[in-house]
Amino acid sequence: MVKNCIKKNVITANKDLLAVHLKLLEDLAESNGVALKFEASVAGGIPIVNAINNGLNANNISKFMGILNGTSNFILSKMTREQTNFEDALDEAQRLGFAEADPTDDVEGVDAARKVVITSYLSFNQVIKLNDVKLTGISGTTLSDINAADQLGFKIKLIGKGTYENGHVHASVEPTLIHKTHQLAAVENEYNAIYVVGDAVGDTMFYGKGAGSLATGSAVVSDLLNVALIFESYLHTLHPEFELK
């Protein structure tokens, strides 16, 4: 359906679609002279797509890593803070609306893996498939694991990661030991954060709400406004008297 619609500007938050067809859709949009915007597809309210495409476009990005799924992060945060087991933390996430009735994609890392595929394309200009992402979820993470990590000075976080070396992308989503002094260790509950390394800027980090209707809505409306500005600029070229109010 989106392929048929791509003759007009398209705004989507559908990460399932983009993780499989992003390159095709971008090529179609370019050939048809229209915009394809998808800020809400990665990390909710964090403007990471715009940051990579525009703010960091003077850099060669070698690595990104981050907390890309709010449900999993909420569960791990609750297990750590309240010393509860995975099942009870998941029940609470579902009760509060942070987890779906079927949480499989979130807790098994599939949702985060889709975001890694999209972010790898943006960061490295390389197409990878979901099956290329080394994937381990958090359903097997126990309270004993969390406490053992704590005694060593670490927290367990579900980390999505992509690195670009020698023309190849290495991508993974897996529970990872993050030292308590690292910025990612302080990211709690439904919040997301993405750590990006560029050759000019060095280390950068983006933080914010990764889920929720307002965070997602903010990203979608931002895309809508950007498309409107593109349209205004084009129309003003044809008709200088026109100005978008």
Where are these regions (language model features)?
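Glycine-rich phosphate/pyrophosphate-binding beta-alpha loops
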Residues: 138, 202-204, 208-214
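Short helix-capping/linker segments at secondary-structure and domain boundaries
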Residues: 82-85, 123-130, 228-233
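Conserved anion/nucleotide-ligand pocket segment
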Residues: 54-108, 112-119
